[in-house]
Protein backbone atom coordinates (compact mmCIF):
# COMPACT_ATOMS: atom_id res chain seq x y z
CA UNK A 1 0.00 0.00 0.00
CA UNK A 2 2.83 2.37 0.92
CA UNK A 3 4.50 1.67 -2.44
CA UNK A 4 1.28 2.51 -4.29
CA UNK A 5 0.88 5.77 -2.35
CA UNK A 6 4.53 6.63 -3.00
CA UNK A 7 4.11 5.97 -6.74
CA UNK A 8 0.93 8.06 -6.84
CA UNK A 9 2.68 10.87 -5.00
CA UNK A 10 5.61 10.70 -7.45
CA UNK A 11 3.22 10.78 -10.42
CA UNK A 12 1.40 13.79 -8.96
CA UNK A 13 4.70 15.63 -8.47
CA UNK A 14 5.71 14.90 -12.07
CA UNK A 15 2.31 16.07 -13.35
CA UNK A 16 2.58 19.25 -11.25
CA UNK A 17 6.09 19.92 -12.58
CA UNK A 18 4.99 19.39 -16.18
CA UNK A 19 2.00 21.70 -15.70
CA UNK A 20 4.22 24.28 -13.98
CA UNK A 21 6.82 24.18 -16.76
CA UNK A 22 4.13 24.36 -19.45
CA UNK A 23 2.47 27.29 -17.69
CA UNK A 24 5.81 29.05 -17.32
CA UNK A 25 6.62 28.59 -21.01
CA UNK A 26 3.10 29.77 -21.92
CA UNK A 27 3.46 32.96 -19.85
CA UNK A 28 7.02 33.68 -21.02
CA UNK A 29 5.94 33.26 -24.63
CA UNK A 30 3.07 35.66 -23.98
CA UNK A 31 5.44 38.28 -22.59
CA UNK A 32 7.01 38.77 -26.02
CA UNK A 33 6.60 42.50 -26.69
CA UNK A 34 7.86 42.49 -30.26
CA UNK A 35 6.26 45.17 -32.40
CA UNK A 36 3.34 43.85 -34.48
CA UNK A 37 1.69 45.17 -37.64
CA UNK A 38 -2.12 44.98 -37.53
CA UNK A 39 -3.81 45.56 -40.89
CA UNK A 40 -7.46 46.27 -41.72
CA UNK A 41 -9.18 46.77 -45.06
CA UNK A 42 -12.54 48.37 -45.84
CA UNK A 43 -14.57 48.62 -49.04
CA UNK A 44 -16.66 51.70 -49.81
CA UNK A 45 -18.34 53.43 -52.74
CA UNK A 46 -17.00 56.77 -51.47
CA UNK A 47 -13.54 56.34 -53.02
CA UNK A 48 -12.15 55.22 -56.35
CA UNK A 49 -8.46 55.16 -55.48
CA UNK A 50 -7.21 53.36 -52.36
CA UNK A 51 -6.25 55.34 -49.26
CA UNK A 52 -3.84 54.04 -46.63
CA UNK A 53 -3.74 55.29 -43.04
CA UNK A 54 -1.14 54.55 -40.36
CA UNK A 55 -2.72 54.79 -36.90
CA UNK A 56 -0.32 55.28 -33.98
CA UNK A 57 -1.80 55.28 -30.48
CA UNK A 58 -0.80 55.07 -26.81
CA UNK A 59 2.92 55.19 -27.46
CA UNK A 60 3.68 56.60 -23.99
CA UNK A 61 7.29 57.34 -24.86
CA UNK A 62 8.14 53.70 -25.61
CA UNK A 63 11.14 52.71 -27.71
CA UNK A 64 11.33 50.21 -30.56
CA UNK A 65 14.93 50.20 -31.66
CA UNK A 66 17.31 53.14 -31.44
CA UNK A 67 15.35 56.37 -32.02
CA UNK A 68 12.29 54.19 -32.60
CA UNK A 69 13.86 53.00 -35.85
CA UNK A 70 11.90 49.73 -35.85
CA UNK A 71 8.59 51.56 -35.59
CA UNK A 72 9.58 54.10 -38.23
CA UNK A 73 10.73 51.33 -40.58
CA UNK A 74 7.36 49.61 -40.19
CA UNK A 75 5.47 52.84 -40.87
CA UNK A 76 7.62 53.67 -43.89
CA UNK A 77 7.22 50.16 -45.29
CA UNK A 78 3.44 50.51 -45.10
CA UNK A 79 3.68 53.67 -47.25
CA UNK A 80 0.71 55.53 -45.72
CA UNK A 81 -1.00 58.53 -47.26
CA UNK A 82 -1.44 60.06 -43.81
CA UNK A 83 -0.47 59.32 -40.19
CA UNK A 84 -3.04 59.66 -37.40
CA UNK A 85 -2.20 59.83 -33.69
CA UNK A 86 -4.82 58.44 -31.31
CA UNK A 87 -3.73 60.10 -28.06
CA UNK A 88 -1.50 59.32 -25.08
CA UNK A 89 1.69 59.67 -27.05
CA UNK A 90 3.29 61.60 -24.19
CA UNK A 91 3.57 60.27 -20.66
CA UNK A 92 6.12 60.86 -17.90
CA UNK A 93 8.51 63.85 -18.25
CA UNK A 94 11.55 61.59 -18.71
CA UNK A 95 10.02 60.18 -21.91
CA UNK A 96 9.08 63.51 -23.51
CA UNK A 97 12.27 63.84 -25.58
CA UNK A 98 11.79 60.31 -26.93
CA UNK A 99 8.29 61.25 -28.05
CA UNK A 100 9.38 64.53 -29.58
CA UNK A 101 12.00 62.71 -31.62
CA UNK A 102 9.50 60.15 -32.93
CA UNK A 103 6.92 62.78 -33.86
CA UNK A 104 9.59 64.89 -35.57
CA UNK A 105 10.51 61.90 -37.72
CA UNK A 106 6.86 61.42 -38.63
CA UNK A 107 6.17 65.04 -39.55
CA UNK A 108 9.34 65.23 -41.66
CA UNK A 109 7.83 62.69 -44.04
CA UNK A 110 4.05 62.65 -43.55
CA UNK A 111 1.07 64.85 -42.85
CA UNK A 112 0.21 64.02 -39.25
CA UNK A 113 -3.10 64.63 -37.49
CA UNK A 114 -4.02 63.67 -33.96
CA UNK A 115 -6.04 64.06 -30.79
CA UNK A 116 -5.18 64.22 -27.11
CA UNK A 117 -5.87 61.31 -24.77
CA UNK A 118 -6.66 61.17 -21.08
CA UNK A 119 -3.00 61.40 -20.03
CA UNK A 120 -2.88 64.94 -21.43
CA UNK A 121 -4.95 65.90 -18.39
CA UNK A 122 -2.95 63.84 -15.88
CA UNK A 123 0.68 64.84 -16.40
CA UNK A 124 2.23 66.72 -13.46
CA UNK A 125 4.71 68.88 -15.36
CA UNK A 126 2.75 69.49 -18.56
CA UNK A 127 -0.80 70.72 -19.06
CA UNK A 128 -2.98 69.84 -22.04
CA UNK A 129 -2.25 73.31 -23.43
CA UNK A 130 1.50 72.67 -23.04
CA UNK A 131 1.12 69.51 -25.11
CA UNK A 132 -0.92 71.33 -27.74
CA UNK A 133 1.96 73.80 -28.13
CA UNK A 134 4.50 70.98 -28.40
CA UNK A 135 2.44 69.21 -31.07
CA UNK A 136 2.09 72.46 -33.02
CA UNK A 137 5.84 73.11 -32.85
CA UNK A 138 6.47 69.58 -34.13
CA UNK A 139 4.11 70.05 -37.08
CA UNK A 140 1.15 67.95 -35.92
CA UNK A 141 -2.36 69.21 -36.63
CA UNK A 142 -4.38 68.51 -33.49
CA UNK A 143 -8.10 68.05 -34.03
CA UNK A 144 -10.15 69.50 -31.19
CA UNK A 145 -13.81 69.37 -32.20
CA UNK A 146 -12.56 69.81 -35.73
CA UNK A 147 -12.59 68.14 -39.15
CA UNK A 148 -10.22 68.51 -42.06
CA UNK A 149 -11.27 67.62 -45.60
CA UNK A 150 -8.11 66.11 -47.07
CA UNK A 151 -7.20 65.09 -50.59
CA UNK A 152 -5.34 61.77 -50.35
CA UNK A 153 -4.34 59.85 -53.45
CA UNK A 154 -6.84 61.86 -55.46
CA UNK A 155 -9.70 61.19 -53.02
CA UNK A 156 -11.50 63.44 -50.55
CA UNK A 157 -11.65 62.14 -46.99
CA UNK A 158 -12.89 63.74 -43.76
CA UNK A 159 -10.43 63.37 -40.87
CA UNK A 160 -12.17 64.46 -37.67
CA UNK A 161 -11.18 64.44 -34.03
CA UNK A 162 -12.22 65.29 -30.49
CA UNK A 163 -10.25 65.50 -27.27
CA UNK A 164 -11.02 63.28 -24.33
CA UNK A 165 -12.63 65.62 -21.84
CA UNK A 166 -12.57 65.50 -18.04
CA UNK A 167 -15.14 63.09 -16.64
CA UNK A 168 -17.61 65.80 -15.60
CA UNK A 169 -17.97 67.09 -19.16
CA UNK A 170 -20.25 65.43 -21.70
CA UNK A 171 -20.86 65.37 -25.43
CA UNK A 172 -23.81 67.75 -25.65
CA UNK A 173 -23.65 69.23 -29.15
CA UNK A 174 -19.90 68.66 -29.51
CA UNK A 175 -20.09 65.83 -32.02
CA UNK A 176 -22.54 67.66 -34.27
CA UNK A 177 -20.34 70.76 -34.09
CA UNK A 178 -17.28 68.70 -34.99
CA UNK A 179 -18.96 67.14 -38.03
CA UNK A 180 -20.62 70.35 -39.26
CA UNK A 181 -18.03 71.19 -41.92
CA UNK A 182 -17.45 67.74 -43.39
CA UNK A 183 -17.91 66.84 -47.03
CA UNK A 184 -21.06 64.73 -46.76
CA UNK A 185 -20.11 62.65 -49.81
CA UNK A 186 -16.63 61.79 -48.53
CA UNK A 187 -15.49 58.93 -46.29
CA UNK A 188 -15.40 60.10 -42.65
CA UNK A 189 -12.86 59.02 -40.03
CA UNK A 190 -13.33 60.07 -36.39
CA UNK A 191 -10.45 60.06 -33.90
CA UNK A 192 -11.52 59.72 -30.28
CA UNK A 193 -9.33 58.16 -27.63
CA UNK A 194 -11.90 56.21 -25.60
CA UNK A 195 -13.70 53.34 -27.37
CA UNK A 196 -16.26 52.86 -24.59
CA UNK A 197 -17.94 56.09 -25.76
CA UNK A 198 -18.71 54.72 -29.24
CA UNK A 199 -22.49 54.96 -28.75
CA UNK A 200 -22.19 58.75 -28.59
CA UNK A 201 -20.88 58.70 -32.18
CA UNK A 202 -23.37 56.20 -33.59
CA UNK A 203 -25.81 57.42 -36.24
CA UNK A 204 -23.74 60.50 -37.08
CA UNK A 205 -22.63 59.44 -40.56
CA UNK A 206 -19.18 58.34 -39.39
CA UNK A 207 -17.67 55.52 -41.44
CA UNK A 208 -14.71 54.66 -39.21
CA UNK A 209 -13.95 55.53 -35.59
CA UNK A 210 -10.38 55.07 -34.34
CA UNK A 211 -9.64 54.69 -30.63
CA UNK A 212 -6.97 53.45 -28.24
CA UNK A 213 -6.85 53.84 -24.44
CA UNK A 214 -7.31 50.18 -23.52
CA UNK A 215 -3.77 48.88 -24.12
CA UNK A 216 -5.51 45.76 -25.38
CA UNK A 217 -6.83 44.85 -21.94
CA UNK A 218 -3.23 44.03 -20.88
CA UNK A 219 -3.65 40.22 -20.69
CA UNK A 220 -5.16 38.11 -23.44
CA UNK A 221 -5.89 34.40 -23.20
CA UNK A 222 -6.17 33.35 -26.86
CA UNK A 223 -9.56 31.84 -27.60
CA UNK A 224 -10.84 32.59 -24.09
CA UNK A 225 -10.99 36.35 -23.54
CA UNK A 226 -9.84 39.42 -25.45
CA UNK A 227 -8.31 41.36 -22.58
CA UNK A 228 -8.60 41.16 -18.81
CA UNK A 229 -8.80 44.81 -17.71
CA UNK A 230 -9.21 48.18 -19.41
CA UNK A 231 -9.71 51.70 -18.06
CA UNK A 232 -13.34 52.86 -17.97
CA UNK A 233 -14.50 49.34 -18.87
CA UNK A 234 -13.25 47.29 -15.94
CA UNK A 235 -12.64 43.55 -16.07
CA UNK A 236 -13.09 41.60 -19.31
CA UNK A 237 -13.69 44.69 -21.46
CA UNK A 238 -15.86 44.29 -24.53
CA UNK A 239 -13.91 46.86 -26.54
CA UNK A 240 -10.33 45.92 -25.67
CA UNK A 241 -8.85 45.76 -29.15
CA UNK A 242 -9.69 44.87 -32.71
CA UNK A 243 -12.52 45.63 -35.12
CA UNK A 244 -16.14 46.21 -34.08
CA UNK A 245 -18.95 46.66 -36.61
CA UNK A 246 -22.24 48.41 -35.84
CA UNK A 247 -25.63 48.31 -37.50
CA UNK A 248 -25.53 51.95 -38.63
CA UNK A 249 -22.55 51.16 -40.85
CA UNK A 250 -19.93 52.63 -38.52
CA UNK A 251 -16.83 50.56 -37.86
CA UNK A 252 -14.69 50.94 -34.74
CA UNK A 253 -11.02 50.00 -34.60
CA UNK A 254 -9.49 49.86 -31.12
CA UNK A 255 -5.72 49.87 -31.26
CA UNK A 256 -3.99 47.82 -28.59
CA UNK A 257 -1.43 50.60 -28.51
CA UNK A 258 2.33 50.70 -28.31
CA UNK A 259 2.98 51.22 -24.60
CA UNK A 260 5.69 49.03 -23.11
CA UNK A 261 6.89 51.52 -20.49
CA UNK A 262 5.33 52.66 -17.24
CA UNK A 263 2.71 49.90 -17.26
CA UNK A 264 1.69 48.41 -13.91
CA UNK A 265 0.35 45.21 -15.47
CA UNK A 266 2.59 43.53 -18.09
CA UNK A 267 1.26 42.76 -21.56
CA UNK A 268 0.60 39.02 -22.02
CA UNK A 269 -0.23 37.68 -25.49
CA UNK A 270 -0.89 41.31 -26.29
CA UNK A 271 2.03 42.67 -28.32
CA UNK A 272 2.28 46.39 -29.02
CA UNK A 273 0.89 47.17 -32.45
CA UNK A 274 0.98 49.59 -35.33
CA UNK A 275 -2.39 49.75 -37.07
CA UNK A 276 -2.52 50.25 -40.84
CA UNK A 277 -5.87 50.73 -42.56
CA UNK A 278 -6.61 50.47 -46.26
CA UNK A 279 -9.80 52.03 -47.63
CA UNK A 280 -10.64 50.69 -51.07
CA UNK A 281 -13.34 51.11 -53.69
CA UNK A 282 -16.13 48.56 -53.98
CA UNK A 283 -17.19 50.00 -57.32
Report each predicted region and the residues it spans.
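N-terminal membrane-anchoring alpha-helices
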Residues: 1-47
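Extended recognition/assembly regions associated with phosphoester-bond processing machinery
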Residues: 33-44, 178-186, 191, 195-196, ...
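Beta-strand-turn-beta hairpins that frame and shape the catalytic cleft
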Residues: 41-54, 140, 147-160, 183-185, ...
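Membrane-embedded segments
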Residues: 48-143
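Active-site metal-binding loops of divalent metal-dependent hydrolases
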Residues: 56-61, 87-89, 118-120, 146-147, ...
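Short, Asp-centered acidic motifs that coordinate Mg2+ and/or phosphate
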Residues: 81-82, 113, 140-141, 157, ...
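Binuclear metal-dependent hydrolase catalytic cores centered on His/Asp/Glu-rich metal-binding motifs
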Residues: 129-140, 147, 152-191, 198-199, ...
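Conserved beta-sheet core of the metallophosphoesterase superfamily
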Residues: 195-275
